[in-house]
Swiss-Prot record:
InterPro entries: Hfq, LSM_dom_sf, Sm. The keyword RNA-binding applies. Keywords: RNA-binding, Stress response. This is RNA-binding protein Hfq. Homohexamer. The gene is hfq. Gene3D superfamilies: 2.30.30.100. Disulfide bonds: none annotated. Transmembrane segments: none annotated.
Length: 82
């Protein structure tokens, strides 16, 4: 795992596992809402009434609907599509 993913992957994985509703703002200003179904290095699958594949390079901000605690650094992160 590259250094750039040391925060991103555990954060997205926590949002996925806890099924936290999120708002995802794209760089063009569009707001998407739903739950993170899965993710990999390049995309996030966002589920609402339909599933959408959102490319990470198009994302500006991910806002959870409630505060989220990241797992401690002692635990290895699980893959996003587990």
């Amino acid at each position: 795992m590259s250094k750039g993913h040391s925060l991103q992957d555990p954060y997205l994985n926590t949002l996925r596992k806890e099924r936290v509703p999120v708002s995802i703002y794209l760089v063009n200003g569009i707001k998407l809402q739903g739950q993170i179904e899965s993710f990999d290095q390049f995309v996030i699958l966002l589920k609402n009434t339909v599933s959408q594949m959102v490319y990470k390079h198009a994302i500006s901000t991910v806002v959870p609907s409630r505060p989220v605690r990241l797992p401690s650094g002692d635990q290895p992160a699980e893959p996003g599509n587990a």
